Amino acid sequence: MYRYPVKSLRGESLARVEIAPGGIVGDRAAALLVASGHARTGKAYRGKEDERLHRLEDEATAVRAAAERGVLVRGEREAPHYFDDSPISLVLAPWLEDAQRICGRALDVRRFRPNLVADALAGVERESDLLGAELRVGARVRLRVTKAIRRCVTVTYDPESDAVDPGILRALAQEREATFGVYCEVLVPGTIVLGDPLLRS
């Protein structure tokens, strides 16, 4: 189980999460915004805009660097979450195995920024097999699968080194129409812990 406190930045692995109607509590609760008010995401950032972005190691340094450039730094809480689509993303182990076969190498699942990673579900081979399905996680949580996730350039970044591998997105586009994983909406909120079963209702 993973949570990403700041959209498009590294996530954290958790053994227990609280799922609210709007998704995992604390997930993508913040985003970096540019002056236009748009969220700064991995889709737009290529690491070339300003080399100083790579040298900021703590909050004080970041604020000082912004002040030197005459940039106003402020916090806003206008949106509860910054999702691309739905509040929960799910990846099944067989889908990861298929992506690894297509790409010809081992892939860290964190590259795809899922919230939930689960084992195989009976009768489910591709994302399309799960569309519209209701899922039960643990004793209480219920989710509905809404759509397959169409992947963007973010998956080309290694989650540890930030090294870029464009071949991953190309391979997924050729054999999977660039889709990997599914989005889910929350039907019944609750708490789930690592190891809770995920079942099709």
Locations of the language-model features?
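Metal-cofactor-dependent catalytic cores
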Residues: 1-201
